[in-house]
């Protein structure tokens, strides 16, 4: 029974981390992942740095840039720049939604303006094959008095059967004193519910990401006041949330944009491997990897054997089927690059 218990736990973890449609298999079959897709942006020195870049990996550790290192998607809407892209596989298993911050610091580096008078909208693309994408759309989600809508992410809520979309905003009601995490609900990423405050802390908070391990949700958030990443857990998306004791990275400073993904499911005699990546913005070093074999312990060690073709900035990772991996590789392999869609 022990191998079966481990296998069932492994299946639950993989399904919960955006693989549900990917891994509809019999319980007698060990789940397999055909590869991983990383969506990111490059920086803010040039307007084209703040667009959407793709990278592929077979093992979730060693990454290869697609499209000859050029952007795959470009936004000419709103502020004509996109940051912090988040890619989600929909529950139907056929649709992908890519949501991003509407912001270009390369065009305007005024921090006060970006916080007090920036975009209230998200830039959204959708696709059914990760190669052919819709035209981008700009959708206002933040409250009318918001000064920005940063680092959006989304997760399917099994209790309400819709998507919880969340982001960081400041608001005029407190003179833009601090960021809070706001949220709204949607079923189609076209129409959204009225926004509401999802995370309220004494300090400013940004860059929330949520991972499910098959038992509990784990929520990483950047405390913008002390410049540290925090970790909480909960049995449900709407809480209650409690801090994970002994989080080993709690004393790190200068990191943001946390993303956590399952590199390898557990198997008999071998624990799962999770990767937490943190954007080391303070040193302009891009993402730094850390690994854990049990999110509940809060223990992470520096990741070894990871390679990146350039400094990946705040982005996201999804697992792929073998067919999806091959399709992306064929469409954007060296010498077969495509003009960016917009």
Name each model feature, range by range.
Residues 9-21:
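Bacterial N-terminal signal peptides
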Residues 1-8:
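Twin-arginine (Tat) signal peptide motif
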Residues 25-342:
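Carbohydrate-active catalytic/glycan-binding domains of CAZyme proteins
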């Amino acid at each position: 029974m022990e191998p079966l218990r481990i296998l069932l736990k492994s299946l639950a973890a993989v399904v919960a981390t955006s693989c549900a449609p990917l891994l509809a298999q019999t319980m007698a079959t060990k789940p397999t992942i055909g590869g991983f897709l990383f969506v990111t942006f490059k920086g803010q020195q040039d307007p084209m740095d703040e667009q959407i870049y793709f990278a592929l990996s077979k093992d979730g550790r060693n990454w290869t840039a697609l499209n000859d290192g050029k952007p795959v998607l470009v936004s000419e809407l709103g502020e004509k720049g996109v940051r912090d892209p988040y890619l989600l596989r929909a529950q139907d298993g056929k649709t992908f939604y890519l949501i991003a911050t509407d912001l270009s610091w390369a065009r305007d580096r005024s921090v006060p303006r970006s916080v007090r008078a920036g975009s209230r909208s998200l830039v959204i693309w959708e696709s059914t094959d990760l190669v052919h994408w819709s035209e981008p759309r700009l959708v206002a989600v933040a409250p009318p008095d918001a000064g920005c809508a940063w680092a959006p992410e989304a997760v399917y809520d099994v209790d309400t059967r819709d998507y919880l979309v969340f982001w960081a905003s400041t608001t005029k009601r407190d003179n833009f004193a601090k960021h809070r995490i706001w949220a709204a609900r949607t079923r189609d990423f076209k129409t959204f519910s009225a926004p509401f405050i999802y995370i309220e802390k004494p300090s400013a908070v940004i860059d929330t990401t949520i991972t499910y391990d098959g038992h509990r949700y784990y929520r990483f958030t950047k405390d913008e006041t002390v410049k540290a990443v925090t970790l909480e857990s909960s049995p449900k998306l709407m809480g209650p949330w409690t801090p994970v004791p002994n989080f080993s990275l709690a004393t790190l400073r200068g990191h943001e944009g946390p993303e956590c993904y399952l590199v390898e499911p557990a198997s008999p005699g071998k624990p799962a491997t999770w990767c937490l990546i943190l954007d080391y913005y303070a040193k302009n070093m891009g993402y730094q990897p850390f690994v854990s074999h049990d999110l509940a312990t809060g223990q992470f060690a520096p990741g070894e054997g990871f390679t990146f073709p350039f400094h990946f900035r705040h982005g996201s990772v999804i697992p792929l089927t073998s067919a999806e991996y091959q399709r992306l590789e064929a469409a954007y392999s060296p010498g077969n690059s495509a003009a960016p869609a917009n």
